[in-house]
A protein has these predicted regions:
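A short beta-loop-beta micro-motif enriched in histidine and acidic residues
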Residues: 36-38, 62-65
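Short, conserved catalytic or interaction motifs in soluble domains
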Residues: 61, 81
């Protein structure tokens, strides 16, 4: 169910390390299901330096406002501007078109603290 080429946080963010070493970050399908229809996303500006587990923004849905946390230390190289006008992309395609930020200068050693797809699925099963 969850792509094997990513790592996952217990806060329900995913990370995809791209061929150039940058990291694409978004929220998982589980997270978007729990949120319901996403109506607004607040993300950091390009150039912002983030530390692992630091709050990087908020996602607002019809149910709640939830904080977003960065799963890796890095610098925001790019923000998915499509989410400004179309936040529903997070619901429609959370693991692809609904990506949130692209990080550069990431600390790849922190990947070991994140979950594989199968570990994340087991984590979700424990949540009930």
């Amino acid at each position: 169910m969850y792509p094997d080429n990513r790592r996952y946080s217990r806060e329900h963010e995913w990370v995809l390390i791209e061929s150039d070493g940058r990291a694409l970050v978004g929220i998982t399908d589980y997270a978007q299901e729990q949120l319901g229809d996403v109506v607004f996303v607040e993300l950091p500006e390009a150039g912002t330096q983030l530390d692992q587990s630091q709050k990087m923004g908020e996602v607002e849905s019809v149910k709640a406002v939830s904080d977003l946390f960065t799963p890796l230390t890095g610098e925001v190289a790019e923000v998915n501007q499509a989410l400004v006008d179309h936040p529903e992309l997070i619901n429609d395609d959370p693991h692809d078109k609904g990506w949130m930020v692209r990080l550069a200068s990431v600390d790849a050693t922190q990947l070991d603290s994140l979950l594989s797809a199968s570990e994340y699925e087991s984590f979700l099963a424990e949540l009930g």
